[in-house]
Amino acid sequence: MAKYYLIHGVVEDKPEKIVKILSDGYLFASSYSTQQGFSGIPLDYVYFSRLGDVNVFMGGFKFILSTKILYKRSFRYALNWVGSDINRTTKINYRYDNVDKVLDEINTHITNGTYSLSPSIDTLHEIILKKKVNLHRYLVAVSDGNYLTPEITDYLKTNYPNVKILTEIPSSADKLSEILEK
């Protein structure tokens, strides 16, 4: 059972955009795609929230990924949203750093409420990966029934047959793991 998952929310989550992302097979940093993220400026990283003991992600279509990627690629994290200011993040090299300890630290930060929300950004932390993330390798579920058109559902069933389609994100990683194991 996984202890944590990564969640990537899509800005302007129109069905055509979701299908395009799925057909590309990658989540691309906004500087590598024609799409802009929450910040509205091109960024070199793909941004994620972490699902653990509590769900802190809000709104929109969500791609839910396995944290296995964090044990295969270096990443950065911040305990509050920093946008393009990469100098305010901590770099983690999976070869030398304790990834489990970092994820536990983020979880403690969230569950203890030791964060401050920016008035315009609804995220308590961020985990960021450079350039692109392979969906075929790490995608485990998608969520948000409001945006699941028949086109998206059919595409997922055909091209991502092992990915669970959820109408909402479970309240914790444990609950998501239970759903994924069914």
Curated annotation (Swiss-Prot):
Q: Record's InterPro entries? A: DUF5846
- Describe the family membership recorded for this protein in Swiss-Prot or TrEMBL: Belongs to the mimivirus L28/L54 family.
Tell me the protein's name.
Uncharacterized protein L54
Originating species: Acanthamoeba polyphaga mimivirus
Q: What is the lineage of its organism?
A: Viruses, Varidnaviria, Bamfordvirae, Nucleocytoviricota, Megaviricetes
